C-alpha cells in the first residue's frame, strides 16, 4: 500500500532525485522555460513555486535557504532580484505546464514548463551575437585555404 507516500520517485535514488531537481530548478530559473518529460515537469512545478515564494521574503535566512536549495549564486540572485519583483502581486501559480506531444525515440509524453509572464529574451542568455561581417571574412579564409 502507498499510504503516506506523497513524493514522486521518478525511478531514481534519493540523491539522483535531489540532483535532478537542483539542475532543473537552475535551468528553469536561468532560461525561464525548459522542455522535459511530463512527470519531471509535474515534479518540478511545486518546487519552483516554493522557491519563488521563498525569494519574495527579504530575510537573510531565506537567502541562505535559497543558496542551500539551488547551490548557484546567479540563480539565487535572479530569484531575489528579478523574479520576486515580477511576481510580488501574485500569490502562487508562478509556473505553467504546457503539453508538447510525444518524444520520437520512446514516445514519452513531453511538456514545456515555463514561468507565467516570462521574459522572452531570457532564452538567449548564452547565445553569442554573431557579426555578419565577421562570418563573411571567415568564409573567405576557408575558401582561399
From Swiss-Prot:
Single GO BP term: translation
Disulfide bond residue pairs: none
Residue intervals passing through the bilayer: none
GO cellular component: cytosolic large ribosomal subunit
One MF term in the entry's GO annotations: structural constituent of ribosome
Region listing for Disordered, in residue ranges: 123-145
SUPFAM superfamilies: Prokaryotic ribosomal protein L17
Family: Belongs to the bacterial ribosomal protein bL17 family.
NCBIfam families assigned to the protein according to its UniProt record, in alphabetical order: L17 (TIGR00059)
Protein name, per record: Large ribosomal subunit protein bL17
Species: Pelagibacter ubique (strain HTCC1062)
Gene from which the chain derives: rplQ
